[in-house]
Amino acid sequence: PESYTDMLASAEMVDRINGNNYEIKTDDDVSEIVFNAEGDMVFAEMKGADYDDPRWETLLNQLDLTEALNFILHGNREYLAMPSVGFLAGRYTENGPNGIGGRGFGSLSYNNFGENPPEWYISEDDENASFGMNIFPSAPVVASTFNPELAYEQGRLIGNDALFVGLPILWGPGMNTHRSPYNGRNGEYYSEDPILTGVVGMEFSIGALDKGLIAAPKHYAFNDQETNRTGVAPYLEEQRAREVELRAFQLAFEATKYDEERGEDVGMLGVMASFSKIGP
């Protein structure tokens, strides 16, 4: 590859890469931020609600400050309870694009079913608790089949696994494009082609949703490398961003709107952002 030896980062660029692009203030007006408001709304009432539904404001105003802080601090996979809005503690998200992995049945399902778990519930002390769920071939192998129907069935199978462990959200599919063969997450990303990536990932997501599992495509966007992915600034031009990186995600976000014959029009219900900056 060609080396660029005469390029120097400006002081402004260095400042932005170091994250010095905002000022932390301690004297802002916070009078409009409300906690502990009286009300009897519960989180479950917002199922299917629009993002701009004004009821969100009412619900969030009921939160206790500690609950809000805990949601931010622990909002990865396991969430703490928020009694003020009837939100139950549980493990609500998990990786990944090639199947729900990393843990056995018992560790995933221990508290997502409440006091009356279904017959297939597997407790942590069950002799089969360490059994895991299906892990599928890597994303490039799936994309290499050029078979959207196969990706759809893969999504359905992973969605079925999610039913066994009470998992509502999956961090996947991986929909970045292969800009470099050295990207540490390429095994989770389909290809270098945005249309192939978008169509296969879209079918995966629709299949998962057929079983009630919300697929959240990742890592939106421009996740070029795994090392130092938190804060690194991938370099790309707007044309590359629009025609390749964002195009793949666009297909997934618009998802079921592409096929009126199937009578589906839900779009995507989740997304996982990248941890990088965008551009120099």
Residue ranges and their predicted role:
Residues P1-P280:
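Glycoside hydrolase catalytic-domain context in secreted enzymes
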